[in-house]
Curated annotation (Swiss-Prot):
Helicase C-terminal domain boundaries: 490-662
Domain Helicase ATP-binding: residue ranges: 164-334
Family: Belongs to the SNF2/RAD54 helicase family. RapA subfamily.
InterPro entries per record: Helicase_ATP-bd (IPR014001), Helicase_C-like (IPR001650), Helicase_RapA (IPR023949), P-loop_NTPase (IPR027417), RapA_C (IPR022737), SNF2-like_sf (IPR038718), SNF2/RAD54-like_C (IPR049730), SNF2_N (IPR000330)
Subunit details: Interacts with the RNAP. Has a higher affinity for the core RNAP than for the holoenzyme. Its ATPase activity is stimulated by binding to RNAP.
Enzyme class (EC, first level): hydrolase
Gene Ontology terms describing biological process: regulation of DNA-templated transcription
Residues spanned by motif DEAH box: 280-283
Amino-acid positions noted as binding ATP in the UniProt annotation, renumbered to this chain: D177, E178, V179, G180, L181, G182, K183, T184
NCBIfam families the UniProt entry points to: PRK04914.1
Cleavable signal peptide: none
Single GO MF annotation: DNA binding
Entry protein name: RNA polymerase-associated protein RapA
């Protein structure tokens, strides 16, 4: 290898050193200085891992002074090169630049530059890069992007709402599904879609204080969204880092109380430029025209500053018309400004609901009914659709569905309000109550008497809370070492029940973490019962492990002991037996407890066991819940209303359980009130709204389509290949689970989403739902998205050389495989990837420019090739550099036609879809005032920007592979 002082070379093994200069040569060695790092390297002359850097006419080079030049001619004299060309800054022509004055920080980013500089990748990395481009492009084009990656069951009504709302510009909607139907999941799906598509980047979630951790856990476990929890302490800390503390995080959860307590804090929240606000339990925001509550005003102020708002609330009729109007007013104050007008409007929806019911019934329609439908929809060209709907043809059903869809678009609050009820959604289990009355131990009787004397000044509410948990009263007097479990009959009963039902998974819930911990110890020590514990003092990872142990069928825990707060946000559908060791203070908490098992998808009827002590607040409460509200065996939408109305009386009975006079009358009154309210709710159901929210057959088809995509085996093969190349260890644990751990030779030292201890993953949705410690891997999971980003944002796999053993071709025949990418640059929120994601175009050219890609499929061809080591590859490249340049020019001439076809198709699709959406909403605007002006303006602006961006779309060479034919 001829070396001359002043020549520029690059290291094949340490390309990060930049451009080296030959500074010393003797008979056996050569020394290179790398000025950008100041390091020297000594190599053997005969076989050194370095490549000569030589540029060609057409290349752009940079001098060590920073100016750039377009090369027009290359001269060689005594082994040194001089480049002649035109300076780009001054446009001076005929400028000469000797190679010794080239910029030493030279980075080869173009695939051809890397190839000619000897920066040759392994063959498997080239294949991975092409697959990453191909799959990435396909995923952007897939329908339902953003709906496939969450760890949830594929429940049609949830998918329907999320699909509708998640694609809107700055959605402002009210989610009012009945309890147990998954409002939190619907909100999470909408957020996931908006964040994934770039429609939103900053999200604020405001919830009651008791639900903060539930939301934090749900967003992380189900959607891989890492929210930051802001409380007083976190807010104070963040003030050191930014003028506005909320600018330090993109995704934030805080409590309503935290938001409204300080005027400055509320101002900071309003100024933080969020894209989306989510408010849970919005029915607690009290409003009247004369006196809106402080909480309501705080949310109103925030909603004015934010483009998108999701309000989650109990069913509207449960709360009265005024309360319902107040919620809608937060979403669109211009549309919902007059309560009296709103009440009048609601009455007018009855004929529309009747018309929908008539269409869905499938009976023949009279002329009067057809005329009425025509008037309601108000379209000129609807006659053929009406005739089809009334015919016996195969199209009748789809025509009726289309008419229903048109009616719902044009009437009611269906664009701003979604509400599903249990009556309209199938798949819920029955609930059966088993009460076990137990004697009150003398130890507790004594403790309660003493407590009554000493706590005479306590309020009735405090006494009532004490009386619910007699073991805590006993411990107050006997100290922490008091062994209440030795005489409490509930413990005896629990042990007996568990030992006689060893094969059943049982969820035991108690109010306090200390009780759960003490029960675990007793069950383990006395009966050897395997029990996992779950309480608020544990980290999310510890809770995941406990839940996973409980979920294991054969070797797992038989029992999961949960505290009230610890179990928030967790569901255990695989269990159907629940023991309430004590009772919660209000009906909402009771429903929350039962809701751990009573979910859609629960395969068995739920058995609720309540062991209670007679003559205690527990005996009062169990009767009131069951006989007064029927709250154990059915969901109780009336519970909170009745609880509030009888609160004082109920508290007095709980505080003094021995005073039973009048209690039967209270229960009777509550039951009557419950039945009346329930009938009122049923009568007030908005069938039109339920049909729209449920989604019907369309929602079912959506769920089935996503289920089909779940079976995509390409993902598993690609993910394993990707993890291999990144350098992540994989250990197959069986049961469709794999443990990933970092290795010492990763492409990056710290891979996002992979902790030091490693993670467990699964590609199976059912396994992910049963095993909380296993992450559900889809194309939308951060692990895959970060991996794709790592490969595609750098130059991994962008240049390689392979040998093709094929005796049908002459030795030394050259082929060049080119991977071009056609793409358009635009802000993420334009969601340009719907129409033109970065799309790979593969070409396989011979030296005459014949493109063989259509005849030679990538994977088949890839299997026929053999790798070349880097050093041999560099020599091969140097030998055929001129030929490769010529083939590259032929490729540049051919790519334009393919790229233009892709860009034109994307323009046509974008224009058609966005114009159709705009026309539809403009037509509806005439009959449905729930379509906001800003939504129409945004769609038109979005359309213009998308078309402009597509006009400027281009293409570039992303990767190339040089193939040399050999016979050996």
């Amino acid at each position: 290898m001829p070396f001359t002082l002043g020549q520029r070379w690059i290291s094949d093994t340490e390309s990060e050193l930049g451009l080296g200069t030959v500074v010393a040569v003797d008979a056996r060695t050569v020394t290179l200085l790398f000025p950008s790092t100041g390091e020297n390297r000594l190599y053997a002359r005969s076989d050194s891992p370095v490549t000569r850097v030589m540029f060609n006419p057409g290349d752009t080079i940079t001098s060590h002074d920073g100016w750039q030049m377009q090369v027009e001619e290359v001269k060689e004299e005594n082994g040194l090169l001089t480049y002649i060309g035109t300076r780009l800054d001054t446009e001076e022509s005929g400028v000469a630049l000797r190679e010794v004055f080239l910029d030493s920080k030279l980075v080869f980013s173009k695939p051809q530059d890397r190839l000619f500089a000897g920066q040759i990748d392994r063959m498997d990395r080239f294949a991975l890069r092409y697959r990453a481009r191909k799959y990435s492009s396909e995923q952007f084009r897939m329908p339902y992007s953003g709906l496939r990656g969450q760890r949830t069951s594929l429940i049609p009504h949830q998918l329907n709402i999320a699909h509708d709302v998640g694609r809107r510009h700055a959605p402002r909607v009210l989610l009012a599904d009945e309890v147990g139907l998954g409002k939190t999941i619907e909100a999470g799906m909408i957020l996931h879609q908006q964040l994934l598509s770039g429609a939103a980047e900053r999200v604020l979630i405001i919830v009651p204080e008791t639900l903060q951790h539930q939301w934090l856990v749900e967003m992380l476990r189900r959607f891989n969204l890492r929210f930051a929890l802001f409380d007083d302490e976190r807010y104070a800390e963040a003030q050191h880092d930014a003028y506005n503390p909320f600018d330090t995080e993109q995704l934030v959860i805080c409590s309503l109380d935290f938001a409204r307590r300080s005027k400055q804090r509320l101002e900071h929240l309003c100024e933080a430029e969020w894209d989306l606000l989510v408010v849970d339990e919005a029915h607690h925001l009290v409003w009247s025209e004369d006196a809106p509550s402080r909480e309501y005003q705080a949310i109103e102020q925030l909603a004015e500053h934010m483009p998108g708002v999701l309000l989650l609330t109990a069913t509207p009729e449960q709360l009265g018309m005024e309360s319902h109007f107040a919620r809608l007013r937060l979403l669109d104050p211009n549309r919902f400004h007059d309560f009296a007008q709103f009440v009048e409007e609601q009455k007018n929806y009855r004929p529309v609901a009747d018309a929908v019911a008539m269409l869905l019934a499938g009976n023949k329609l009279s002329n009067d009914e057809l005329n009425m439908l025509g008037e309601m929809i108000g379209e000129q060209d609807i006659e053929p659709l009406l005739q089809a709907a009334n015919s016996d043809s195969e199209d009748a059903q789809s025509a009726r569905q289309e008419l229903v869809s048109m009616l719902m678009d044009r009437h009611g609050t269906s664009r701003v309000l979604f509400r599903n009820t249990r009556n309209g959604v199938k798949g819920f289990p029955k609930r059966e109550l088993h009460t076990i009355k137990l004697p009150l131990p003398t130890q507790y009787q004594t403790a309660i008497k003493v407590s009554g004397i000493m706590g005479a000044r306590k309020s009735a509410e405090d006494r009532a809370r004490d009386m619910l948990y007699p073991e805590r009263i006993y411990q107050e007097f006997e100290g922490d070492n008091a062994t209440w479990w030795n005489f409490d009959p509930r413990v005896e009963w629990l042990m007996g029940y568990l030992t006689s039902h060893r094969s059943q998974k049982v969820l035991v819930i108690c109010a306090k973490a200390a009780t759960a911990l003490q029960l675990e110890q007793v069950l383990r020590e006395r009966e050897g019962i395997r029990a996992a514990v779950f309480h608020e003092g544990m980290s999310i990872i510890e809770r995941d492990r406990a839940a996973a142990w409980f979920a294991e069928e054969d070797t797992g825990a038989q029992v999961l002991l949960c505290s009230e707060i610890g179990s928030e946000g967790r569901n255990f559908q695989f269990a159907s037996h629940m023991v309430m060791f004590d009772l919660p203070f209000n009906p909402d908490l009771l429903e929350q407890r039962i809701g751990r098992l009573d979910r859609i998808g629960q395969a068995h009827d739920i058995q609720i066991h309540v062991p209670y002590l007679e003559k205690t607040a527990q005996s009062v409460l169990v009767r009131w819940y069951h006989e007064g509200l029927d709250a154990f065996e059915h969901t109780c939408p009336t519970g909170r209303t009745i609880y509030d109305s009888v609160y004082n009386d109920l508290i007095n009975y709980l505080a003094s359980p021995d005073q039973t006079e009048g209690f039967d009358d209270l229960i009777k009154n509550c039951r009557e009130q419950h039945e009346a309210l329930k009938a009122q709710l049923e009568q007030g159901r908005d069938r039109l709204l339920e049909i729209h929210s449920n989604g019907g057959e369309k929602a079912q088809a959506l769920a089935e389509s996503i289920e089909e995509q779940d079976d995509d085996t390409n993902l598993i093969a690609f993910a394993m290949n990707l993890l291999d190349i990144i350098g992540i260890n994989q250990d197959d644990r069986g049961d469709n689970m794999i443990v990933l751990t970092p290795s010492d030779h990763m492409l990056v030292p710290d891979f996002p989403g992979l902790s030091e201890d490693g993670i467990t993953i699964t590609f199976d949705r059912e396994v992910a739902l049963a095993r909380e410690d296993a992450q559900f891997i889809t194309w939308e999971h951060p692990l895959i998205r970060n991996g794709l980003d790592l490969i595609l944002s750098g130059d991994t796999g962008s240049s390689t050389i392979s040998l093709l053993k094929n005796k049908a071709l002459p030795v030394g025949t050259l082929l060049v495989e080119l991977i071009y990418v056609v793409e358009a640059q635009a802000p993420k929120q334009l969601q340009l990837n719907r129409f033109l994601p970065p799309t790979p175009v593969r070409m396989l050219l011979d030296k005459n420019g014949n493109n063989l890609a259509a005849q030679v499929e990538f994977e088949t061809f890839n299997r026929q090739l053999n790798a070349v080591n880097r050093h041999t590859g560099s020599k091969l490249v140097n030998a055929v550099q001129q030929d490769v340049h010529a083939i590259l020019q032929l490729g540049e001439a051919q790519i334009e036609k393919s790229a233009r076809a892709l860009i034109d198709a994307a323009r046509n699709e974008a224009d058609e879809k966005l114009s159709a959406e705009l026309s539809r909403l403009e037509a509806l605007r005439a009959v449905n005032p729930n379509i906001r002006d800003d939504e129409l303006t945004a769609i038109e602006s979005n359309r213009q920007q998308v078309m402009e961006s597509l006009d400027q779309a281009g293409w570039r060479l992303d990767a190339l592979r040089l193939i040399v034919v050999t016979h050996q």
